[in-house]
Amino acid sequence: MKVGEQIILAARKQAEGQLEVHKANIEVYRTMPAGIGEHSDVTEAVIAELDKMSSAYDRIEMIEKFFSKNDN
């Protein structure tokens, strides 16, 4: 694998990892909202996590669109 391909793969893996972290955080809010002391507004906290998920997902889509191995 070429260095450029490794960089793109690393960027994709980082975005995938961030996506999973934020999904897990939302699951914590969904299953234990009373147990999150520093977040009195769970809805706002979930919206913030969704925004972070959106950013990571957008990066994955950009990588697929512009740096896919299936480019013609």
Identify the residue ranges that each predicted region occupies:
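Extended, charge-rich alpha-helical interface modules
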Residues: 2-72
